[in-house]
Amino acid sequence: MDSITVKKPRLRLVCLQCKKIKRKCDKLRPACSRCQQNSLQCEYEERTDLSANVAANDSDGFNSSHKLNFEQQPVLERTGLRYSLQVPEGVVNATLSIWNAEDMLVIVGLVTFLDYPFAAHSLAQHDQYIRALCASLYGMALVDFSNYANGIPCEDTSRSILGPLSFIEKAIFRRIEHSKQFRVQSAALGLLYNAFSMEEENFSTLLPSLIAEVEDVLMQKKDCEILLRCFYQNIYPFYPFMDISLFESDLTSLLLQDDNNRWKISTEVKNVRKKIETLSLLTIVMAMALMHSKLDANLLSMVKENASESARKLSLLCHKLLCLLDVFRYPNENTFTCLLYFYVSEHLDPESPDCVLSPTNLLTLHHLLNLSMTLGLQYEPSKYKRFKDPEVIRQRRILWLGVQSLLFQISLAEGDAGKSNSEYMEAYLTDFEEYIEASSEYEKSSASESNVQMNDIVWNKYKFHVILSKLMSDCTSVIQHPQLFHILGNIKRSEDFMAENFPTSSIYQPLHEKEPNAIKVGKSTVLDVMDIQKTEIFLTNIVGSMCFLNIFDVLSLHFEKKCVMHWEEYEKNYHFLTLKSFNAYLKLAGLISDYLENKFQGNILESRGYIIDKQICFMLVRIWMFQCRILLRFSYKQESQKKLASSSISTNDNEKEDEMIVILERLIKHIRNQMAHLVDLAKGKLQDSYFGAYQTVPMFRYVVYLIDVGGLVSVTNGFWDKISSDGEIPPKVQQAVRLKWGLDCNNSRRIKQKLISSQSLQSFNQVLLCQMEDAVLSSSFAIKANTAMSQNTAEEFFNISEEEALNQLLENNNFDAFWDLLGENLSDMPSL
């Protein structure tokens, strides 16, 4: 067979600087004119690199010529840069086998799902200490409730340590009220659900009815225009899934003005599907703007309630309109735009009860990703020769970028990074760069400086997403076992890219009077590009920092387990990765505390809260979990050291143990203050506005209380002690704990033994503790937390007992609802 001729890679003549900012290059050597004018270092791709690639291709023969584009050398790795890992001496490379499906499974009542590797529940199950604490609190709550239901009085009415119900009573009551109020909700949009469609016989009567409902909810024209402007200025810049000019044009043909200065919706049969698409988009846009407006602290509570009710009605109407369009049977770009905004509205809803990302939320996001691929959005639009209209090409491009930005913002840090999507993203980036080099039309569409900057923001975030996806994909694989140094190298690459393209220094700099770098969207909306850029810098940094924290944390736990039997080989790894995770936590916590305290000197506007705050609520839970993980180790280590000190005969040994106990006491106080500081900040800024924060803030105030009274260890051991001592835990409670947390109550002695054994934390030693204390003392966040906090966090809860809390919760026939919240089936419990 004749050898197949392999096409040689084309040498890119554009210099790297001009290519980066997407400007025309005159290709002069050794330095182009633009780089000379701006005193930039001008560099071109080397032919030697390309010739090496050609040689490799030639040697591969027939099979190589049939590889997909994304299997060739990635566009982001052509620079030839080599990253120094900077690992301490003694840290060894190792093959990692981290994940166990058992630790990601969740079974609560009638719900079963496999969580993502870095999701909150998976991380809790991955750590034996947090897992034991969560299972103990959950089990004791079920026991108390079971005893109450059976009329069994509390064994100890004067408990020295309060249970969690005293703290979370109000949150549970509000959750019960919420479950009653929203008992019937619209189903998640998906392949298997459709209430009605345009093909039904009663469509001619159904549509006017829906239109009348929309008109009834909409306000006067001037108020609607204010809400649209609010959406354009505060929401659209971060979710630019549509062309505002086209949307406004569609509105002019849809809306008529009646005599009462209100909008009247046209009911002409002509282009009815297009009108329903526009109407569904209008309803969800207005719902999001209303939700944004109700976060204004200066609004009267009655106005907030009306805005919330109107937003909920508009959201439900949008859902009905999307069902009418039958969006999964008749997919197109316009309905996909509506679906994206509907999803964002549900995700950002301050009244959502989710404390962490729910499986429903993530499953819906994957529906959207799959639908985008059904539409063929994963391929650069220029690859389709049948698309001639530049508006269609632009729309398809922004929709692909849109769904990927949602994955980046919402699910990437959870460990949702499939290789298939990463490959599509990278191939898309390669094709797009080739397109802009060959196309003059793209340059015309982004000729202004502001447009260039906006494009840089979007594409830099996309490139960072590609890099992080590869990193997360390597870390979460259950089939391939990566090498530690390979992971560390990818982390370094990701950190460097984030620091270069999203520097946090710009959001801490004082604002100076200068003309806004404006870009016009639609007829009359002007956006400040620098303002958008600074908000994106913050959002990108907290996502990237969360990814790094999750990876370092899990690697630390992995080597902690290894050190139980092989401490000589892996202790250096454990110390290095624990310190890396601790520093990553301090950095992320510092960013979030600075945001909550408005420390960015006006660089991030208060009106951005609707975009940012929901993500902050979720990330705070992750940070508090990390603090719990560290506090549990400090506390158990302290107990172990006290036992060693009391049993030591040698004076020198006693002095060593005493010194370590003192260090642990200081560290416990530091982390306690950091947790309490973030809890207080969240209480002040988020708790009243966000239902999720309303539930999580008091729960972690309870953890602060346990630290203050020295009860963290005893509460963690409590459930397991109760099983071991009297064995009176009801079988249904034991089963519930086993299914939700994967801990078999029959092994309660073994579970507790692992917690209290000095061998479990033998490498969590003084060397590491001193390094952690140094990190705390050099952290501005830690210093600020120590200054801000007092010891009075839990005083308001001291005057209510567990039994009184249950009495208050279960009055007014709340029994069924409360049991539902615990995730259990009422039929398995005794009746009152």
UniProtKB/Swiss-Prot annotation:
GO biological process: positive regulation of transcription by RNA polymerase II; response to xenobiotic stimulus
Residues passing through the membrane, by range: none
Gene: RDS1
GO MF terms, alphabetically ordered: DNA-binding transcription factor activity, RNA polymerase II-specific; sequence-specific DNA binding; zinc ion binding
Gene3D superfamilies assigned to the protein according to its UniProt record, in alphabetical order: Zn(2)-C6 fungal-type DNA-binding domain
Function: Zinc cluster transcription factor involved in resistance to cycloheximide.
Keyword GTP-binding: no
Primary residence: nucleus
Protein name in UniProt: Regulator of drug sensitivity 1
Keyword Nucleus recorded: yes
Key words of the record: DNA-binding, Metal-binding, Nucleus, Transcription, Transcription regulation, Zinc
Localization: Nucleus
GO cellular component labels: nucleus
Classification lineage: Eukaryota, Fungi, Dikarya, Ascomycota, Saccharomycotina
DNA-binding span(s): 15-42
Source species of the chain: Saccharomyces cerevisiae (strain ATCC 204508 / S288c)
